[in-house]
């Protein structure tokens, strides 16, 4: 049995070698191990417990990776231009006028003030002194000095007289207006009284005609009824034996 065992093993080895040679091409890589080993498959992850109500539908349950919440603010839509008409109007730009440099020789109203006048200029006090001295340029109404004062008093009297005349004219106009108003009221009262009397007269004539008409109707009724009365009296007399 030992004699036949070793040749039998040798024959099987030769058969396997020939099958290897004829069945596939010879390659030195066959002597080496498999260079590209396939990665081991990852074990399946356990199902994630839901954080919300199990009865609600959530699309994140179909994905293994957790959903990342973004904290980025949403993009605002572009601002639309306001097409409505605005009532505000911009102030027009104007060029500023440069200040004019004052010339000491120009006319200025402030020169008439007493504080700005020099010693040799005319002021209000000079005019007061002239009036207090009794100066009057109108020579026809008086002479110099006291005569001028009398002329001034006369002028004031004339002014008072003109004012009195104006007041009398105003009073005359007022009296005329009152008189015209009274006259119009009197004329209106007379005309209304006349129209009232005319209407009253017309109604009295109408009432008289109506009374005569009614009276005539009664007379005709009496005349038509008298023969019947007489006939009834004759019948009653004939019936008496």
Curated annotation (Swiss-Prot):
GO terms for biological process: cell adhesion. Residues 143-154 have a biased composition (Gly residues). One of its GO terms (cellular component) is plasma membrane. Residues 24-173 are extracellular. InterPro entries: CD99L2. Keywords: Cell adhesion, Cell junction, Cell membrane, Membrane, Signal, Transmembrane, Transmembrane helix. It comes from the Eukaryota. Residues 30-168 are annotated as: Disordered. The chain crosses the membrane at residues 174-196. Belongs to the CD99 family. This is CD99 antigen-like protein 2. It comes from Xenopus tropicalis.
């Amino acid at each position: 049995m030992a004699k036949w065992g070793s040749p039998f093993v040798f024959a099987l080895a030769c058969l396997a070698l020939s099958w290897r040679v004829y069945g596939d091409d010879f390659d030195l890589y066959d002597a080496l191990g498999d260079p590209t080993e396939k990665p081991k498959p990852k074990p399946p992850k356990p199902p994630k417990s839901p954080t919300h109500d199990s009865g609600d539908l959530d699309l994140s349950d179909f994905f293994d990776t957790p959903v990342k919440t973004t904290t980025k603010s949403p993009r605002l839509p572009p601002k639309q231009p306001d097409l409505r008409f605005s009532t505000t109007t911009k102030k027009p730009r104007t060029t500023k006028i440069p200040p004019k440099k004052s010339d000491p020789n120009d006319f200025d109203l402030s020169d008439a003030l007493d504080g700005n006048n020099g010693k040799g200029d005319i002021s209000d006090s000079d005019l007061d002194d002239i009036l207090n001295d009794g100066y009057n340029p109108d020579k026809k109404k008086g002479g110099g000095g006291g005569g001028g004062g009398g002329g001034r008093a006369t002028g004031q009297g004339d002014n008072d007289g003109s004012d009195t005349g104006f007041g009398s004219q105003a009073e005359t106009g007022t009296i005329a207006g009152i008189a015209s108003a009274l006259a119009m009221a009197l004329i209106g009262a007379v005309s209304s009284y006349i129209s009232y009397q005319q209407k009253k007269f017309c109604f009295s004539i109408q009432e008289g005609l109506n009374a005569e008409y009614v009276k005539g109707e009664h007379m005709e009724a009496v005349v038509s009824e008298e023969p019947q009365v007489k006939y009834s009296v004759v019948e009653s007399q004939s019936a008496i034996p």
